[in-house]
């Protein structure tokens, strides 16, 4: 049973790493949008309120938090679906083992995601 959990743990790391890359691409896109919004706001005094809001550090932080939450939500949903499929196959369709494997893997995925978010937030400070 521990071997199954160990193997599934590596599967989750493989699942979440590409998702993290997508999240970083989203963060890069957001940084570009921030730069564009700031240049637009300074070039045009009557720029839209969205561009001016992005120039505000608090609004930028809130927008970044929303983007991170969406990326994390997508990653967790995908991880849950894959965990169920992998655990179901590994447990040989035994309900108790399936539930136990799924709980273990979801906890591991949440710990990994928490670590990634804390690491990202530390870099932002």
Swiss-Prot record:
Residues 1-21 form the signal peptide. Disulfide bonds join 101-124. Residues 22-91 form a propeptide. It comes from the Eukaryota. Expressed by the venom gland. Belongs to the formicidae venom precursor-01 superfamily. Neurotoxin that causes irreversible rapid flaccid paralysis in blowflies and honeybees upon intrathoracic injection. Causes a quick and irreversible cytolytic effect (at 10 uM) indicating it possibly acts as a pore-forming peptide. Shows only weak effect on aphids (A.pisum) at high doses 24 hours post intrathoracic injection. In vitro, is not cytotoxic on the dipteran S2 Drosophila embryonic cell line. This is U11-myrmicitoxin-Ta1a. It comes from Tetramorium africanum (Fierce ant).
